[in-house]
Curated annotation (Swiss-Prot):
Gene3D superfamilies per the UniProt record, alphabetical: P-loop containing nucleotide triphosphate hydrolases
SMART domains: AAA
Gene Ontology molecular functions: ABC-type transporter activity; ATP binding; ATP hydrolysis activity; ATPase-coupled transmembrane transporter activity
Transmembrane spans: 517-537, 547-567, 592-612, 623-643, 764-784, 1182-1202, 1219-1239, 1260-1280, 1298-1318, 1322-1342, 1450-1470
Coiled-coil spans in chain: 14-67
Cross-referenced PROSITE patterns: ABC_TRANSPORTER_2
GO cellular component assignments: membrane
Low complexity bias spans: 15-39
Protein name: ABC transporter G family member 17
Keyword Nuclease: no
Span of domain ABC transmembrane type-2: 507-751, 1182-1405
Length: 1476
């Protein structure tokens, strides 16, 4: 009974407290419509359109019905919802939104629509993760250590050899939330908030174990997996296709989530249109419908607008339970509140259960929720009504600062540096997370909530909401969707929608399409020119095969870009899979459907050019079979390469696997090595190679039915006396398939004798190619359905060996708290700043848009002085980041006008180096640890005369002050892989990297974005101490609490269009600031109100904010503006400057040091960058060990393919092809090096913007760091290939072969880097790469001998090809010592006339030809001709190569390497600045 009374009192207290917690907030929005400016994410001219659309949607659906709301008239005289508590009155847009949802719900009930009312109950939930001490940074030594453990017999007797240390991410959590209610999850980063939301959303794959019960209504978690998509987890990252527009993004989701039981006579299209217009109006995206979403690399929506798209997409998905994880990141305070209100309205009207974690939630947002749970290091320290949470902790002995919001107070309890203990409670309040959890579990409130949870579960068992829920889920499915399907739409509908989206993505990427088709045109004409009009003679037999080989390989290589495309789309695919939008297999099918038309076009374009230029037979059936076969090659190759991406976790793993398979495809193609020469151990790959079947098919297609003349080349011959061999019956064509006495060779005979190709199997071979395609499709469908290589945003930390901290250990927690406290107390002693006075006047910025200039900043002026902290505010899209970019000299596009001065002088070349810029995007090199990143910044940006020991000591101080001491040896990693530090920790690292440079001025762009309230408070407090130490700062901030806002001295407030609303002092308790707005007719700001929210509301910020005042114009007419103008003029005088910069200018020996662009000289830069790159490469096992494995494996494959070559003439041809294929290693390295270069180039652009190091230091370091890895790769390839193939093993030949091959590999790698430096992105470089590769391979003299080339190619392109000199050196070295001894199979057999012997008959012939003739029998006149007598015969007669040119050729390759180094330097210099 006592518990029942307590429970009842909780409910009453909850409602009353909701009504009284923030009494002074009632009037916060009373004047929402008083003022108007342009500070929104859309034009104010569209407000009337938005209202009209709302009105149209509402009227059409409601039919002027009366709005119904539950009002508690007894206890609340203010007519506010009981469940909402005391909160701001709804404005007009909120009212219309609520009205729309209520009326649509009412009409749906008329058609038997069942509500999906599903609450959530969590009992004894414990989530276990892997301990950090098990997670050691992987490097190149890791495989060897693992192999050592495997080979160590003693390891097999250890009892705990497989033991994994674990820790509890969540510990014994109990909570519940009813349907239609909202639960707020609060906690610092690392508290387990995201894990709790993921587990509620039934995403459990990332954890070792999940114990306890989570029930959805009366459905257990194990059964809830059938309803994937009914619980949604929306993370803080915005993951979208950047090239799709807002309309395309949302319409795609609507297509797949349109319910089957719509209102009568409402079509799918009408439903989608209404919902789309409602949501874009609701989130202020009406005018952005045709704007690309964009990302950090593609221009599109602003950060705030992109966040709204993420929110809108999740809302469209129609889940009954939605988990929002910090979804307000990047939104200003007004927009965040508007978003939270929309959640409240949908929870009320649609019975949605909403569970959300918020960073920096205001009281206005807090009061929208029903319950709150507070977590600390995975332990629940409070769960219950929002109205009782604050009092609970006050009763424990904690105190709350004035104007501090309740959410900030609650999460501040978990931070020893933040919380305040009441007088008299010292030593009595709980200290650690364990203490706080114990206090909670011993409280009466805990028992009451436990009782309330039991009552809720009983109610659920009685009402059985699952019955209506399951019925409605079935009703929402389309008619063609299986009842057992997790999806709302059928597989067919999914495929159609995905195909339309894929078409938009493919067709929208005009740049890549243009690059691809340009490559096809260029190379097709080059191929046609090289193999132009092949003669119908035996001289054209081999080159015809070369032309076919080239076309097949070309169409195969063209599709290799699909690997990168499949990898880049993974995260979007997995997000949509969790939303239950579509099956991954439907996504893959859509890619295939779009592949077909584009591949048809590219194949027919290529075929139309080359087929007729090759001089192939002019027959329509043969032409179309040629095209059809190449279509099969392209389709099967595209699916194969996508398969490598779908079956592997990373780019470099997929690339290595693709290269490995590609080696087999080329070697066992049937061209460079005929089937009869293949060894049994690898010959089976010939039969599973689709390219081999394509080669056979096209060879049959071309050769069948043709006769090839050998009139001029039949042996024996005498070019000086034609009558010598006038008897044609004793002559024969010198090719396989020939018959003595016939001066032509049938194509069918040649195919069988030379290549073992049955000319009757053309159709069969084509069918096999397409069967391979279907097989690859099946493999991919399996992979995309059952493999998920993304982390889903969950991050797992890895550390240097032995450096991992103890997790959730009480003693370790106390130690960390002491370290942070000590560092904070000593901060002033640690920080010694040398600030400057920075001013700007009449700053305007325009960018070219669609042929006109768009003004983004308009006449901005202001200053920052030493010791002052200036806030830069405005709604999303007002131009805050743009202004910071301009002030920090980061803009490389557009036109900037106006004047910026540092200490009264024009900005010097060192400005970017001596200023710190904390950018909004957290860009860090993932291969470094936190400490290494900070030390790198300190070493290269602090002054060179500062001792290294002092720089490192300062780094340690910053680590302590930023609360990152325990993360110093943690790998930064990436969010995509899930290995590394979290989003919040990356933000702190971004700030730390700038602080360790000891800048004179600090620009900070959203330093608290993505941080919790306590971390934000710590950051701002830390920045305040920097200002107090003499550093001038300007900081953009979106959602400052009143406590944070009080740390600033001045504010620059911007309106939409980059116009100034106010610049000046904030004043004590913000009186100076608020009085300015009050003088212009805005209501007074109350004592309990957040001034930051007040000014945003006054200026019409937020999604639907309005104002009647033209604030930019009001500013220009104010006395404050004139004061700013006068002050700027005053700051130019020496007298005024002397007040601020007495010690700020650097002096050396009494003289002012000249400004330096970089702090250190070139040699120091090169050494430090090279050392950093070595660390990164050493830790990138997939890249380095992958390249080693690839070199060894490809070498073994080639070596055993050409195993133990003898001295026959056919084996000489095999030696040539073996040397030709030695270039393959270079090609494989290109495909590995290009992605790595682009990755490092992106980090270089970020570093060079802050003047860490120069472009030539980066270029030369990138070249140098690759050299040892390339040398080792080449050596492994040489060892695996050289002796297995039976090449001359003399020391000189060995050394030359290794040296030449290594030098060529080094050159190829630097050439790949030059290509990467020249191209804007990797897609362009991949598109351009085939031109380079085919130039190297086709015009080197092997596939088509120089005499067979046209003069255009032979006279200059052939001689410019570095591969020509490489192969001349290798082949002449390999063939020079060989004495050719033909086998019986290699001999070309003919008979001498009666009365003569073989030697006599062939004597005139041998005087003009290479080789020798031997009698085959003592009793007959049968002779055998061996085409070569020595290895020199081939390269001297056919190629015109000279053994004496070996070292000349080596020198030429070195020269090519030098030219590629110059190319890298040149192109890096041209592209060093990012486009922004």
């Amino acid at each position: 009974m006592e518990e029942d009374k307590t429970f009842q009192s909780i409910r009453i207290s909850e409602n009353n407290n909701n009504n009284n917690n923030n009494n002074n907030n009632n009037n916060n929005n009373n004047n929402n419509n008083l003022n108007n400016n342009n500070d929104n994410d859309y034009d104010y001219d569209s407000i009337n359109n938005i209202e009209e659309k709302f009105e149209n949607v509402s009227k059409e659906l409601e039919g002027q019905s009366i709005k119904f709301r539950e009002i508690d008239g007894g206890k609340n005289n203010n007519n506010h919802d009981i469940e909402l508590g005391e909160r701001k009155p709804e404005n007009e847009e909120d009212f219309k939104l609520r009205q729309y949802f209520e009326d649509s719900q009412r009409q749906k009930m008329l058609i038997n629509h069942k509500p999906k009312k599903m609450g959530v109950s969590i009992k004894n939930l414990t989530v276990v993760g892997q301990g950090a001490d098990n997670s050691v940074i992987v490097d190149n030594s890791t495989p060897f250590k693992a192999l050592g453990k495997l080979l160590n017999p003693f390891n097999y007797f250890k009892k705990d050899k497989n033991k994994i240390n674990t820790f509890n991410i969540l510990n014994d959590i109990n909570a519940f939330i009813e349907d239609g209610k909202m639960l707020l999850v609060l906690g610092r980063p690392g508290a387990g908030c995201s894990t709790l939301l993921r587990v509620i959303a039934n995403q459990r794959e990332s954890y070792i174990s999940v114990d306890g019960d989570v029930t959805y209504g009366n459905i257990a978690a194990s059964d809830w997996s059938k309803y994937r998509g009914e619980t949604l987890y929306t993370g803080e990252e915005d993951i979208h296709h950047p090239t799709l527009t807002v309309r395309e993004t949302l319409d795609f989701t609507l297509k797949l989530k349109t319910p089957g039981n719509r209102l009568p006579e409402e079509s799918k299209r009408n439903f989608r249109t209404k919902i789309y217009e409602l949501l874009v109006s609701m989130y202020g995206l009406v005018n952005q419908g045709d704007t690309m979403v964009g990302n950090e690399f593609v221009r599109g929506l602003s950060g705030g607008e992109r966040k709204r798209i993420t929110i809108t997409e999740a809302m469209v998905s129609g889940s009954s339970i939605t988990c929002w994880d910090c979804s307000t990141r990047g939104l200003d305070a007004a927009s965040a509140y508007d978003y939270a209100k929309s959640l409240r309205i949908m929870s009320d009207t649609l019975d949605k259960t909403t569970i959300a974690s918020f960073y920096q939630a205001s009281d206005s947002i807090y009061n929208l929720f029903d319950k709150v749970i507070v977590l600390d290091k995975g332990r629940c320290i409070y769960f219950g009504p929002i109205g009782l949470a604050k009092q609970y902790f006050l009763d424990l002995g904690f105190d709350c600062e004035p104007r501090k919001s309740t959410p900030d107070f609650l999460t501040g309890i978990t931070n020893p540096q933040e919380r305040i203990v009441k007088v008299g409670f010292e030593g009595r309040v709980p200290e650690t997370s364990v203490d706080l959890e114990d206090a909670w579990k011993k409280s009466q409130l805990f028992q009451s909530m436990k009782h309330a949870q039991l009552e809720y579960e009983k109610q659920v068992e009685q009402q059985k909401p699952s019955v209506d829920f399951k019925e409605q889920v079935l009703n929402e499915k389309s008619r063609t969707t299986s009842k057992n399907s997790e999806y709302s739409s059928s597989f067919y509908a999914q495929t159609i929608a995905l195909t339309q989206r894929q078409l938009s993505l493919t067709w929208g990427d005009k740049f890549t399409l243009t690059s691809r088709f340009l490559t096809i045109l260029v190379l097709s004409f080059i191929f046609g020119g090289i193999y132009f009009q092949q003669p119908l003679t035996t001289d054209g037999l081999f080159t015809r095969g070369g032309a076919i080989f080239t076309s097949i390989i070309f169409n195969c290589i063209l599709t290799q870009g699909e690997l990168h495309g499949a990898l880049s789309g993974r995260r979007i695919l997995q997000k949509h899979k969790s939303y239950a939008l579509y099956r991954p297999s439907a996504y893959f099918v859509s890619q295939i459907l779009i592949d077909i038309p584009f591949i048809l076009v590219q194949v027919f374009l290529h075929s139309f050019i080359v087929y007729f230029m090759y001089g192939f037979e002019y027959r329509a059936d043969k032409f179309f079979i040629f095209c059809f076969t190449l279509v099969g090659v392209s389709l099967s190759s595209a699916s194969l390469f996508r398969g490598f991406a779908n079956f592997t976790p990373s780019l470099f793993t997929a690339q290595n696997l693709m290269n490995f398979v590609f080696i087999f495809e080329v070697n066992y193609f049937g061209y460079s090595q005929t089937p009869d020469k293949m060894h049994s151990w690898f010959k089976w790959t010939y039969y599973i190679n689709p390219l081999a079947y394509a080669f056979k098919s096209l060879m049959i297609n071309e050769f069948k039915g043709l006769d090839f003349s050998c009139l001029d080349s039949a042996i024996p011959f005498d070019h000086f006396n034609n009558s010598t061999y006038s008897d044609m019956s004793h002559r024969i064509c010198a090719v396989p398939g020939s018959i003595e006495g016939s001066l032509s060779v049938k194509g069918e005979n040649y195919l069988w004798d030379a290549l073992q190709i049955n000319s009757d199997h053309r159709a069969l071979n084509v069918v096999v190619i397409f069967l391979f395609w279907l097989f690859y499709i099946g493999l991919n469908l399996f992979a995309v359905e059952y493999f998920d290589w993304t982390s889903g945003g969950y991050t797992h930390k890895v550390y240097k060996r032995g450096k991992a901290p103890k997790l959730n250990d009480v003693e370790e927690e106390r130690n960390q708290n002491q370290i942070v406290k000590k560092a904070t107390d000593n901060m002033k002693d640690t920080l010694k700043m040398r600030g400057g006075l920075f001013s700007w006047k009449s700053i305007s910025y325009t960018v070219p848009v669609a042929g006109t200039n768009k003004l983004l900043l308009d006449d901005i002026m202001g200053w920052i002085k030493p010791g002052q902290m200036t806030a830069l505010m405005g709604s999303s899209g007002a131009g805050k980041t743009t202004l910071l970019d301009v002030l920090a000299k980061r803009k490389t596009m557009g036109t900037v006008t106006g004047e910026s001065l540092l200490n009264g002088k024009q900005l010097e070349i060192d400005f970017e180096r001596i200023t710190g810029y904390v950018e909004q995007m957290d860009v860090h090199n993932p291969g470094l640890t936190v400490r290494e990143a900070l030390r790198f910044s300190a070493k290269l940006r602090q002054e060179p005369w500062v001792p290294l020991k002092d720089k490192y000591q300062y780094v340690e101080h910053v680590l302590e002050m930023m609360e990152m001491k325990h993360l110093g040896d943690a790998l930064i990693g990436t969010l995509e892989t899930g290995v590394g530090i979290s989003v919040e920790e990356r933000k702190r690292l971004t700030i730390g990297v700038e602080l360790v440079a000891k800048p004179q001025i600090l620009f900070l762009d959203e330093p608290t974005s993505g941080l919790d309230a306590q971390s934000s408070y710590n950051i701002i407090k830390f920045i305040r101490k920097l200002a107090d130490a003499g550093m001038p700062l300007v900081c953009t901030i979106h959602q400052p609490s009143s406590v944070l806002f009080e740390h600033f001295d001045r504010i620059l407030l911007l309106a939409r269009g980059g116009k100034t609303v106010y610049f000046g002092d904030i004043g004590d308790k913000s009186k100076t600031l608020t009085s300015y707005f009050e003088r212009h007719g805005v209501r007074p700001c109350t004592e309990s109100e957040n001034p930051a929210e007040y000014i945003l509301e006054a200026t019409g910020a937020g999604i639907h904010g309005k104002t009647d005042v033209n604030w930019p114009e009001a500013w220009k007419q104010s006395s404050e503006y004139q004061n700013v103008v006068n002050e700027l003029d005053l700051l130019r005088t020496k007298e005024e400057l002397g007040k601020y910069i007495l010690d700020s200018d650097l002096q050396v020996d009494g003289k002012q040091a000249p400004p330096r662009e970089f702090a250190n000289g070139f040699l120091t830069q090169f050494i430090e960058v090279y050392k950093r790159l070595n660390i990164i490469y050493y830790r990138d096992v997939f890249y380095t060990m992958g390249s080693f494995a690839q070199s060894a494996v490809s070498g073994l494959v080639i070596g055993f393919t050409f195993y133990d070559l003898k001295n026959s003439s056919s084996d000489q041809q095999q030696r040539i092809f073996m040397s030709w294929e030695a270039m393959i290693l270079g090609v494989l390295l290109i495909y590995l090096v290009l992605p790595m270069f682009f990755i490092q180039k992106e980090y270089f652009k970020r570093d060079t913007a802050s003047k860490y190091y120069s472009w030539h230091a980066f270029s030369l370091s990138m070249i140098a760091v690759e050299i040892p890895y390339v040398v080792l790769s080449s050596t492994l390839f040489f060892i695996a290939t050289y002796w297995t193939s039976g090449i001359d093993s003399t020391a000189s030949a060995n050394f030359y072969y290794w040296l030449m091959h290594t030098m060529f590999s080094v050159y190829i790698v630097s050439f790949a880097q030059a290509l990467g430096a020249a191209c804007v992105n990797i897609a362009i470089s991949i598109a351009a790469l085939p031109i380079v590769l085919f130039y190297l391979f086709l015009l080197c003299g092997v596939q088509i001998p120089p005499p067979a080339m046209s003069s255009f190619y032979q006279d200059w392109l052939y001689h410019l090809n570095p591969a020509k000199y490489f192969l001349e050196g290798l082949i002449t070295t390999v063939l020079k010592p060989i004495e050719v001894l033909c086998t019986d199979v290699d001999l070309i057999k003919f008979t001498a006339p009666s009365g003569t012997d073989c030697q006599t008959y062939s004597a005139p012939f041998l005087q003009q030809a290479t080789g020798y003739v031997v009698p085959l029998s003592n009793t007959t006149n049968e002779c055998g001709y061996c085409i070569y007598s020595s290895g020199s015969d081939y390269f001297e007669t056919s190629l015109g190569w000279d053994y004496g040119h070996r070292w000349r050729n080596f020198g030429i390759i070195v020269a090519y390497w030098g030219s590629s180094i110059l190319a890298v330097l040149f192109f890096v210099y041209l592209t060093q600045k990012p486009r922004r």
